[in-house]
Design a protein with these regions (language model features):
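Gly/Pro-enriched, hydrophobic low-complexity segments
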Residues: 144-229
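N-terminal mature ectodomain segment of secretory-pathway/periplasmic proteins
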Residues: 27-95, 133-141
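Flexible, processing/modification-adjacent segments and terminal tails
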Residues: 14-20, 89-164, 187-190
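Bacterial Sec-dependent N-terminal signal peptides
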Residues: 1-18
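Short, surface-exposed beta-strand/loop "edge" segments at domain boundaries and coil↔beta transitions
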Residues: 48-55, 73-80, 94-99, 160-165, ...
Length: 229
């Protein structure tokens, strides 16, 4: 079992500011500044302890505000498309979806927008930390986890954006994003941490290939997402 423990060491004589660290990380993941014009499709296989295998195809065109999610779970397949202000849903090839199916599979436009934001955020890191409403603690932290030292940024958000507290862990040599964790209430040690392994380049962006999820509270393994193109 992976044990997520470590020591937070504020760097009083900082080698670089939090802003400089983020710049270095973005330079690593998006060396040619392609993210704002990102246009590509990729696949995510989600393996969960308590749920059946879920395979998703995600298409993003950030410049055109286009998002498409096609999901396969067992014998069922559904799609959600957001094209600017328009939303379209289908289930097993039909757009005529019963209320029962909508409720069972949580198939609605609000959910589609949530998934758009979810995939754009997680696969757009660390570039998404430049978004409006993001509050980056100016103090760079050094943290030792499982014998490895990381540079760490603490991030919170304006109330209208989000209420969670996030920590992002960067490789001390390459500045690659290696793990992150979030808390709903840090005093309760709730929330989850995510370990990133390997990389895959999608449309010029270095994205994590494997993401493994664990509870902060007891290191319980929750599942794994595997990226492919």
């Amino acid at each position: 079992m992976l044990i997520f423990i470590g020591f937070l060491i504020p760097i009083h004589s900082q080698l670089f500011s939090a802003d400089e660290l983020l710049n270095k990380a973005i330079e690593y993941h998006d060396p040619n500044s392609f993210w704002n014009d990102f246009k590509a499709s990729f696949y995510v296989k989600m393996e969960s302890v308590k749920r059946p295998l879920r395979t998703s195809k995600i298409t993003l065109d950030l410049k055109q505000s286009f998002f498409n999610l096609s999901v396969q779970v067992e014998e069922n397949q559904w799609t959600s498309t957001i094209n600017k202000d328009l939303c379209e849903l289908s289930f097993n090839g039909t757009k005529e979806i019963s209320k029962e199916i909508q409720n069972k599979f949580k198939l609605n436009c609000e959910r589609a927008a949530m998934y758009r934001d979810y995939y754009t955020y997680l696969y757009g890191l660390p570039m998404k930390l430049r978004d409006a409403g993001t509050l980056i603690d100016p103090q760079v932290i050094e943290k030792l986890v499982d014998g490895i030292s990381y540079w760490v940024l603490k991030v919170t958000y304006e109330p209208e954006v989000g209420s969670d507290t996030w920590y992002f862990y960067f490789d001390q040599k390459t500045y690659a994003l290696k793990r992150y964790q979030f808390f709903h209430d840090e005093s309760l040690n709730d929330g989850e941490y995510i370990i990133l392994e390997d990389e895959l380049e999608i449309a010029g962006i270095r994205m994590p290939k494997d993401r493994s999820w664990f509870y902060n509270s007891d290191n319980t393994y929750l599942g794994k997402d595997t990226l492919s193109n």
